[in-house]
Curated annotation (Swiss-Prot):
GO terms for cellular component: cytoplasm. Gene3D superfamilies: Vaccinia Virus protein VP39 (3.40.50.150). InterPro entries: PCMT, SAM-dependent_MTases_sf. Catalyzes the methyl esterification of L-isoaspartyl residues in peptides and proteins that result from spontaneous decomposition of normal L-aspartyl and L-asparaginyl residues. It plays a role in the repair and/or degradation of damaged proteins. The active site is at S66. It is an enzyme of class 2 (transferase). It is found in: Cytoplasm. GO terms for biological process: methylation; protein modification process; protein repair. This is Protein-L-isoaspartate O-methyltransferase. It catalyses: [protein]-L-isoaspartate + S-adenosyl-L-methionine = [protein]-L-isoaspartate alpha-methyl ester + S-adenosyl-L-homocysteine. The lineage of its organism: Bacteria, Pseudomonadati, Pseudomonadota, Betaproteobacteria, Rhodocyclales.
Length: 216
């Protein structure tokens, strides 16, 4: 199951990594992490043959598993120039795919998901992969996870109209935050916590599901 056959085989997975290289992902540690995680484990069985396409796929409950390029791009922004992501918070764990990639690059991942059924899927997937350095919590991601902060890296998998203040408060000095922002047109925001304050760089146009409050 982990190695896959046919459209989920190692060869198919290797082609996905080559596509990421062609699209501009240069960080070898990020590419290695993407190659290490079997994406087909995280998608519905009916979609397994599409698991290594560079596209977002539906998870149910109005949510998606993110496009591999976008996952790699966001993690590369967090990692570049560092040997590790350090203590990392993921907002919007979904089925756990991105958390599993993050877990290849640090020993300390905290991931929150507001939808209980998706969180249970993520927990089951972590058990399948024996990925024991991911702590999953049912929580409102806009509030972060203050009891576990501050964080060296924060990554958000849903777009709000603004940057949630709680996430800035939980970003450690020297920390990095990457998230989509925008209620209509969205862009990728990269924020660094410098001695002079928070410095934001606006990057690629993106499309994510909305960042919602509360839990279900």
């Amino acid at each position: 199951m982990l190695h896959g056959i046919g459209m989920t085989s190692q060869r198919t997975r290797a082609r996905m990594i080559e596509r990421l290289r062609e699209k501009g992902i240069r960080n070898e540690a990020v590419l290695k992490a993407m190659a290490a995680v079997p994406r087909h484990v995280f998608v519905e069985e009916a979609l397994a043959s599409r698991a290594y396409e560079d596209t977002a796929l539906p998870l149910g409950m109005g949510q998606t598993i993110s496009q591999p390029f976008v996952v790699a791009r966001m993690i590369e922004l967090l990692l570049n120039g560092r040997s590790s992501l350090g203590k990392t918070l993921e907002v919007g764990a979904g089925c756990g795919y991105q958390a599993a990639v993050l877990a290849q690059l640090t020993k300390d991942v905290y991931a929150v998901e507001r939808l209980g059924p998706l969180l249970e899927k993520a927990k089951a997937n972590m058990r399948i992969l024996q990925q024991f350095n991911v702590r999953l919590k049912h929580a409102d991601g806009q509030l972060g996870l203050p009891e576990a902060g501050p964080f060296d890296s924060i990554i958000v998998a849903a777009a709000g109209s603004h940057v949630p203040p709680a996430l800035l408060e939980q970003l450690a000095p020297g920390g990095r935050l990457v998230l989509p922002v925008g209620a209509g047109e969205q862009y990728l925001s990269f924020i660094e916590h410098t001695p002079q304050g928070y410095v934001e760089t606006r990057l690629d146009a993106v499309r994510f599901v909305p960042l919602l409050s509360g839990t279900q």
